[in-house]
């Protein structure tokens, strides 16, 4: 019976991926189970472009390189230096009015969307909410409500991932948030999903679908930490790096700062 349940999850996910596949698609890729499983399945139905984003030697770039090699897909690496990352962060914050935490989290997706060569952008968003992947779930299973986590994300997606996709003329695909996958996930309790390391049933289903155990059992860093964006953002706050777009005078900078508050949210500064 357990194999039947896992098969239901696998079939639902493969169906969701297949339904959104065009001839050519781009996948925002980190090398963790969420994006790797989507990429592995999509490669059966489409020509897949993988894009990973991060600072030099970041966890996501190294993980993505090894995962892409395992599933035998080409990988495009967008490696940003500190100034480039902060420049993109400023643009992202202005466009979407996100908090600093959200900017750090969404930067890899933003850069992937900006550089996508294909019109469909597929991602692994939703896997943690639907299948119980966050560490905080393991710390307090009794207080975890995966249905509520999923509903909350579905409300956020239109103003975040979907909006970014539209800005670059892309169609967004989030297979883990398809109705079929969400319903299939309910075959297991939250405790069974969360397990010891998180997303236990998704990992088992992924192996059943043929994904490498090495990838399926990987622990994944949060996007903002895996890509290195959060580290750079903290450096900005502490003024450890110097990224400047100089104005004619402090008076001009101060005038622009006041005129754009609260939109600039700390991005425009005067000395």
Can you say where each PLM-predicted feature lies in the sequence?
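ATP-dependent adenylate-handling ligase core
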Residues: 56-113, 134-144, 185-194
């Amino acid at each position: 019976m357990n194999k039947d349940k896992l098969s239901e999850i696998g079939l639902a996910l493969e169906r969701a991926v297949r339904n959104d596949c065009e001839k050519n698609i781009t996948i925002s890729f980190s090398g963790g189970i969420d994006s790797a499983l989507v990429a592995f399945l999509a490669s059966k139905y489409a020509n897949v472009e993988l894009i990973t984003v991060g600072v030099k030697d970041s966890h996501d770039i190294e993980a993505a390189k090894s995962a892409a090699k395992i599933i035998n897909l080409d990988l495009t690496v967008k490696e940003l230096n500190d100034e480039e990352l902060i420049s993109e962060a400023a643009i992202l914050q202005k466009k979407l009015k996100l908090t600093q935490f959200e900017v750090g989290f969404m930067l890899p997706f933003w850069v992937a969307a900006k550089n996508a060569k294909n019109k469909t952008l597929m991602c692994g968003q939703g896997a943690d909410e639907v299948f119980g992947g966050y560490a905080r779930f393991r710390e307090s299973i009794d207080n975890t409500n995966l249905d509520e986590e999923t509903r909350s994300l579905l409300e956020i997606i239109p103003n975040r991932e979907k909006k970014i996709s539209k800005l670059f003329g892309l169609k967004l695909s989030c297979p883990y948030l398809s109705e079929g996958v969400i319903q299939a996930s309910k075959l297991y309790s939250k405790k069974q999903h969360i397990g010891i390391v998180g997303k236990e049933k998704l990992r088992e289903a992924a192996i059943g679908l043929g994904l490498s155990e090495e990838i399926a059992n990987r622990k994944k860093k949060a996007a903002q930490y895996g890509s290195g964006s959060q580290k750079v953002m903290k450096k900005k706050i502490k003024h450890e790096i110097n990224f400047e777009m100089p104005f004619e005078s402090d008076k001009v900078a101060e005038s622009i700062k006041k005129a754009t508050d609260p939109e600039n949210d700390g991005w425009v500064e005067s000395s």
